[in-house]
Amino acid sequence: MLQLCSTFRPQLLLPCQFRFTNGVLIPQINYVASNSVVNIRPMIRCQRASGGRGGANRSKPAKPQVKEGSNKTVIEGLVTESLPNGMFRVDLENGDNILGYICGKIRKNFIRILPGDKVKVEMSVYDSTKGRIIFRMSSRD
């Protein structure tokens, strides 16, 4: 019987077989103690069309925090006030008080930022009143 589905390649399923996710044919062996009979059944494993389980390619080098040629600087600061929609008041090391918003990776990974936390803020040279919070340094001391 031929089975087609959107995320897996077509495969041939024989009776009494199980499906796994990586395209290898493995014999399944059953031992019966009373008759000393060994049954060997081939098992077909299917493979995803994408070829992997997803996620990051671990062989690639890590990205630098700030790309070369960009007009951004990274400054450390202290969160003083929490505002709605992932916005914060941040006091920078140089004495400025800016509006900081959290970056997408912090939002995606549900990293909590509270008043009193030290953060790294990425700022553009064009607007010195706003910055993107790219890293939460450590727990509150």
From Swiss-Prot:
Residues 63-138 form the S1-like domain. Transmembrane segments: none annotated. Pfam families: eIF-1a. GO terms for cellular component: chloroplast; cytosol. Residues 49-69 are annotated as: Disordered. Keywords: Chloroplast, Initiation factor, Plastid, Protein biosynthesis, Transit peptide. One of the essential components for the initiation of protein synthesis. Stabilizes the binding of IF-2 and IF-3 on the 30S subunit to which N-formylmethionyl-tRNA(fMet) subsequently binds. Helps modulate mRNA selection, yielding the 30S pre-initiation complex (PIC). Upon addition of the 50S ribosomal subunit IF-1, IF-2 and IF-3 are released leaving the mature 70S translation initiation complex. This is Translation initiation factor IF-1, chloroplastic.
